[in-house]
């Protein structure tokens, strides 16, 4: 069947840059990759992109906890994510980050267009504020009972049980995830996207066939309950992009995250030196196709906010959203205690990528159903299908071809009608890949594999090989078996990239969709090497145990200075500039009568003397040893009246306290009065 080449842009949901990739993530990336590889086999121009979702308070707080900058943390996380995806042979054309200049420019562009078109509204809101941490609480840092379905322990922006979205202030009995404190209300000016203005457009888009039936039905419920304006701003401190002309206000992560699809593609176009393609794919009247593979937990954002943002800023909308369900393991939610919360990297330490790719693919359909990774069934299915049915078909015929015929296949097919049965299946299997009915495609392929093995069993080449004057029959039978193996591997090529590479090396030819119409006749194959190894439950047991150990290690208390004394909240440069640090010479140091903690220091600031009380006595039992040293002091600190006198500043020291206090000293050459910058 001849197809017209299409231009296709495919994305996966952006993994959040504060944690490792696990097997739940991998379902989506494998599903998308199989579909993309099939599209490429059919000759379409496919751009497959992704990025890390790298903004938000969770990243800011975790970086503080680790004692590193958010930029450093997301950089390290990006490398880990890309390594995991490469390990599973996810064939991205580009993997980027939402914390990029491309994404900043596009976010500001879309925001400015929405504002110019009247879709951004300003209003003062009452917002939850953590009195202990001194910060406004993002949606995901408030938990409570869902106001719609009354499910407990739900986040402040949407319910994972009923899918409803709401304001954090609507939560019943909210608690701060950061400190556990009960939040208080404070006013703050915020910016809102006028989503209700797009209700008519969204309802028409919903009915256009751009969504799975289950998603379209869910959207109808949201329309019936009424669309609300969407808060797209967050208050400092926040790690993200500051909103233009709005100091201290930042784009909410869910505004710039989907724009990250555009940012990653723009980055790819720039790398290629291809400035035309970006507009060709994203302009309002684009004929290119745009598909988002996402999980059912983020349907609301992708089916309402995202197309409305694109419409309001004069960009094209997605051709379709491909939504999948969750992953369970052994019939239950992934569990850290049971060792079934398995990271992608842990999996690759015990199994190859093709095995999981195959198992997920065999269970996937176009519906939004959850997928269960039953580890015992996984072992049985991989061995039964990949090893016993497919690889065994090659191994049981290749030996005779290599030993008896120097690797050369017969010049004619032994059973042309059987071969035609295999190639005629291309249309049904191709349609199944196209429509994401992956399980159906696998069932069709395995039915053919059974047919191929039945042919070999009936022809019994091992018997023919012992009979005189039947070399031609032996060559024909085994060549037929190898040709059928070639067709099967062509159909499985989108699923099993590494096994395909080994099969192509053995067959001495590239596997292409259209190529199967011509069998390999008189063709020389290479010596056969083992294509795939059986797996067993011992590997599963080791995998589960390794996952448990990783959880124990991660749960171990973090020790060290930063864990004991975390970094304080982020301040602005202007805040820091108010602190006047100066080099000071310690002219005198003495005990303070009546205090077992303080030393009285007389400091020379280069023309001005200061009297400072400092709680460093336990670390410096001989104060005379400090005389003549240079140190750093806060020179513009308001004088503080103490019962021992007036303290006119503060000297700088490091350490946990007690005897472990270390007075800071400038490098040689610094003089009293020099400002520390």
UniProtKB/Swiss-Prot annotation:
Its EC number is 6.1.1.10. InterPro entries: aa-tRNA-synth_I_CS (IPR001412), Anticodon_Met (IPR041872), Met-tRNA-synth_bsu_C (IPR004495), Met-tRNA_ligase_1 (IPR023458), Met-tRNA_synth (IPR014758), Methionyl/Leucyl_tRNA_Synth (IPR015413), MetRS_core (IPR033911), MetRS_Zn (IPR029038). A motif ('HIGH' region) lies at residues 15-25. It is found in: Cytoplasm. It catalyses: tRNA(Met) + L-methionine + ATP = L-methionyl-tRNA(Met) + AMP + diphosphate. Its main location: cytoplasm. Keywords: Aminoacyl-tRNA synthetase, ATP-binding, Cytoplasm, Ligase, Metal-binding, Nucleotide-binding, Protein biosynthesis, RNA-binding, tRNA-binding, Zinc. One of its GO terms (molecular function) is ATP binding. Its cofactor is Zn(2+). A motif ('KMSKS' region) lies at residues 333-337. GO terms for biological process: methionyl-tRNA aminoacylation. It comes from the Bacteria. Zn(2+) binds at residues 146, 149, 159, 162. ATP binds at residue 336. Residues 575-677 form the tRNA-binding domain. It is an enzyme of class 6 (ligase). GO terms for cellular component: cytosol. Binds 1 zinc ion per subunit. Coiled coil: none annotated. It holds the Pfam family tRNA-synt_1g. Belongs to the class-I aminoacyl-tRNA synthetase family. MetG type 1 subfamily. Homodimer. Is required not only for elongation of protein synthesis but also for the initiation of all mRNA translation through initiator tRNA(fMet) aminoacylation. This is Methionine--tRNA ligase. It comes from Shigella boydii serotype 4 (strain Sb227). The lineage of its organism: Bacteria, Pseudomonadati, Pseudomonadota, Gammaproteobacteria, Enterobacterales. The gene is metG.
């Amino acid at each position: 069947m001849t197809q017209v080449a299409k231009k296709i842009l495919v994305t996966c949901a952006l993994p959040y840059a504060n944690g490792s990739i696990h097997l739940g993530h991998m379902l989506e990336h494998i599903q998308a990759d199989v579909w993309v590889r099939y599209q490429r086999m059919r000759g379409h121009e496919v751009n497959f992109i992704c990025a890390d979702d790298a903004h938000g308070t969770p990243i800011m707080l975790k970086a503080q906890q680790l004692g590193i900058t958010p930029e450093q943390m997301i950089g390290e996380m990006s490398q880990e994510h890309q390594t995991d995806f490469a390990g599973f042979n996810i064939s991205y054309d580009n993997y980027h980050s939402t914390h990029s200049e491309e994404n900043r420019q596009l976010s500001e562009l879309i925001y400015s267009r929405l504002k110019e078109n009247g879709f951004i509204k300003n209003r003062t809101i009452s917002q939850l504020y953590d009195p202990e941490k001194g910060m406004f609480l993002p949606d995901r840092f408030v938990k409570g009972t869902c106001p719609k379905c009354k499910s407990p322990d739900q986040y402040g922006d949407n319910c994972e049980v009923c899918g409803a979205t709401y304001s954090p202030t609507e939560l019943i009995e909210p608690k701060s995830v950061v400190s556990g404190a009960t939040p208080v209300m404070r006013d703050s000016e915020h910016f809102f996207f006028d989503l209700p203005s797009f209700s008519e457009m969204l309802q028409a888009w919903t009915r256009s066939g751009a969504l799975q039936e289950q998603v379209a039905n869910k959207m109808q419920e949201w329309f019936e309950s009424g669309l609300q304006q969407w808060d797209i701003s967050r208050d400092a401190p926040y790690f993200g992009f500051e909103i233009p002309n709005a100091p201290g206000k930042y784009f909410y992560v869910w505004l710039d995250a989907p724009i990250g699809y555009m940012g990653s593609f723009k980055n790819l176009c720039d790398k290629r030196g291809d400035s035309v393609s970006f507009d060709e794919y994203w302009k309002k009247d684009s004929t290119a196709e745009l598909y988002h593979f996402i999980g059912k937990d983020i349907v609301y954002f992708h089916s309402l906010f995202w197309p409305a943002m694109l419409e309001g800023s004069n960009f094209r909308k997605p051709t379709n959203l491909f939504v999948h369900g969750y992953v369970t393991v052994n019939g239950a939610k992934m569990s850290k205690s049971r060792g079934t919360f398995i990271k992608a990297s842990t999996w690759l330490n015990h199994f190859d990528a093709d095995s999981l790719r195959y198992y997920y693919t065999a269970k996937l359909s176009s519906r939004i159903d959850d997928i269960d990774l039953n580890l015992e069934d996984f072992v049985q299915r991989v061995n039964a299908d990949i090893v016993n049915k497919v690889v065994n078909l090659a191994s049981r015929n290749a030996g005779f071809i290599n030993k008896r015929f120097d690797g050369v296949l017969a010049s004619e097919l032994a059973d042309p009608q059987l071969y035609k049965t295999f190639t005629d299946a291309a249309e049904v299997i191709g349609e199944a890949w196209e429509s994401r009915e992956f399980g159906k495609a696998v069932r069709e392929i395995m039915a053919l594999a059974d047919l191929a093995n039945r042919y070999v069993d009936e022809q019994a080449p091992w018997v023919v090989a012992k009979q005189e004057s039947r070399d031609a029959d032996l060559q024909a039978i085994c060549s037929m078996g190898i040709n059928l193996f070639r067709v099967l591997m062509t159909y499985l090529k989108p699923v099993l990239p590494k096994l395909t590479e080994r099969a192509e090396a053995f067959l001495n030819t590239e596997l292409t969709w259209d190529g199967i119409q011509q069998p390999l006749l008189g063709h020389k194959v290479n010596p056969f090497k083992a294509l795939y190894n059986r797996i067993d439950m011992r590997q599963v047991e080791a995998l589960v145990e390794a996952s448990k150990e990783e959880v124990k290690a991660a749960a171990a208390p973090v020790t060290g200075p930063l864990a004991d004394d975390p970094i304080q909240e982020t301040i602005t440069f202007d805040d820091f500039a108010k602190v006047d640090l100066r080099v000071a010479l310690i002219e005198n140091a003495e005990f303070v009568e009546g205090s077992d903690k303080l030393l009285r220091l007389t400091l020379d600031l280069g023309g001005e003397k200061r009297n400072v009380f400092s709680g460093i006595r336990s670390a410096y039992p001989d104060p005379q040893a400090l005389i003549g040293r240079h140190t750093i002091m806060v020179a513009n600190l308001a004088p503080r009246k103490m019962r021992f006198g007036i303290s006119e500043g503060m000297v700088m020291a490091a350490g946990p306290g007690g005897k472990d206090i270390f007075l800071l000293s400038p490098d040689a050459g610094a003089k009293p009065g020099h400002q520390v910058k």
